[in-house]
């Protein structure tokens, strides 16, 4: 610019040579190119999912660690389902309040894009929480010690941030990894967010992602017998 001005060119003439074509970008759903819209709507739900994993695994694992699992089962009538519901429902309520407050801050106070209204995203947040709890129960059922269970939860939760399509598009991944993304609740929440909050598509087109989140609720039933056996017979070794 200074060289051109020294040669007697006007600023308009110089800019025409430096940047002959000006890109006028208006992305759908985020016309301001606000990075906070992208970052907060992806990272914060991932943090919530990770915390649900850890709290679920820890709360069940401590029963095994401190040898209180038999008493816990007795309080639930020796039913693993009743015992899990009694332990996890208060956590569900707390995490749901936190998740809804997160939505209120982002979409209400900060006016982030919410093109399909509140209901689709609040429902997605609730399903993310209960599906993450179901995955957490599965984790501690597979590895019924606090140490290994928490390691599993931490690893799975941290991998979520990179494998579900936040930092690298899923379409560019190996086909095997593309299939594995379906195993993470956060992936389905992210797709719901893109369709409902950003693009404002009809709810019909996102029903499959809601169904996937509900499908994770099957996991505790698959591991329930093994978890109950661990609660009754497993001896914790420091």
Provide a role label for each language-model segment:
Residues 15, 24, 28-32, 72-85, ...:
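Juxtamembrane loop-helix boundary motifs flanking transmembrane segments in multi-pass membrane proteins
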Residues 1-55, 227:
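Transport-system extracytoplasmic interface segments
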Residues 29-106:
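Hydrophobic alpha-helical transmembrane segments of multi-pass membrane transport proteins
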Residues 93, 101-105, 112-238:
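Membrane-spanning alpha-helical segments of multipass transporters and channels
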Residues 8-13, 18, 79, 104, ...:
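Homeobox/homeodomain signature
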């Amino acid at each position: 610019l200074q060289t051109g001005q020294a040669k007697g060119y006007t600023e308009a003439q110089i800019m025409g040579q430096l940047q002959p074509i000006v890109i006028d970008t208006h992305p759908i759903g985020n016309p301001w190119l606000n990075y906070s819209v992208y970052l907060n709507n992806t990272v914060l739900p991932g943090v919530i999912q990770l915390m649900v994993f850890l709290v679920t695994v820890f709360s069940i694992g401590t029963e095994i660690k401190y040898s209180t699992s038999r008493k816990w089962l007795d309080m639930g009538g020796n039913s693993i389902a009743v015992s899990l519901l009694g332990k996890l429902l208060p956590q569900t309520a707390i995490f749901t309040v936190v998740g809804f407050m997160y939505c209120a801050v982002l979409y209400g106070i900060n006016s982030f894009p919410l093109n399909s209204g509140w209901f689709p995203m609040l429902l997605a947040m609730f399903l993310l929480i209960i599906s993450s709890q179901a995955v957490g129960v599965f984790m501690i059922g597979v590895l019924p010690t606090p140490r290994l269970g928490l390691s599993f939860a931490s690893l799975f939760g941290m991998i979520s941030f990179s494998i579900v399509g936040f930092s690298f598009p899923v379409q560019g991944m190996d086909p095997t990894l593309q299939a594995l993304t379906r195993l993470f609740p956060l992936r389905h929440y992210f797709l719901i967010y893109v369709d409902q909050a950003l693009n404002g598509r009809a709810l019909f087109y996102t029903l499959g992602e809601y169904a996937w989140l509900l499908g994770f609720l099957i996991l505790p039933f698959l591991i329930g017998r093994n978890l109950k056996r661990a609660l009754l017979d497993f001896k914790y070794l420091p």
